[in-house]
Amino acid sequence: MSKIKLFDLSGKVQEEIELNQKLLVSEVHKQAIFDAILAENLSQIQGTHSTLKKGEVSGGGKKPYQQKHTGRARQGSIRNPHYVGGGIAFGPKPNRNYKIKVNKKVSSLAFKSAITSKVNNNEFLGLVDSIKQDKPSTKAIAKLLKELKVNKKVLIVAFEKNENLEKSSANLPNVSYKLWNQVSVKDLIDANCVLAQKSAINNWVERLN
């Protein structure tokens, strides 16, 4: 059974909970993680790149020089791909769709594997739901991370929108803030430490059930 500690904003342990087994897998599936991250990366490619083919380049309709008696290789147009300023052979066109489909089973397996990987490496910590600030305070978040001895990439996962917590995290270059339903497999893998609120963890369990 995997247990994690829930910390408050001062870095003190308030509770220890047992992670629901529906959130974990017995073995981390690296291929599922790879497929999920690849699909996410490819989905961000707009596909608006475009090049001109030989027939689309302006000018150069005239034969550069006569066919014979020049001692040079015959040429039909300066729009040919091997000419500077000529068309591009087999260049990209904007009608290409880079997106690949990952079915729900693999996507779910990838998410669980990412969580399991973080738990196994002691990179998954909990935060209490009752984190409330009167105003944004970068100093408070920096102090929390110092207490937890976390000085690398941190992902804070909230169960509901918390503007003060979000703004407090925004000024720290190594800290990112996301709502539980915005977190992807890539977000989990990229982070060196995941700090998730208790209700955010429960929401993940319900979604994966």
UniProtKB/Swiss-Prot annotation:
InterPro entries: Ribosomal_uL4, Ribosomal_uL4-like, Ribosomal_uL4_dom_sf. GO terms for molecular function: rRNA binding; structural constituent of ribosome. Gene3D superfamilies: 3.40.1370.10. Keywords: Ribonucleoprotein, Ribosomal protein, RNA-binding, rRNA-binding. NCBIfam families: rplD_bact (TIGR03953). Part of the 50S ribosomal subunit. This is Large ribosomal subunit protein uL4. The lineage of its organism: Bacteria, Bacillati, Mycoplasmatota, Mycoplasmoidales, Mycoplasmoidaceae. The gene is rplD.
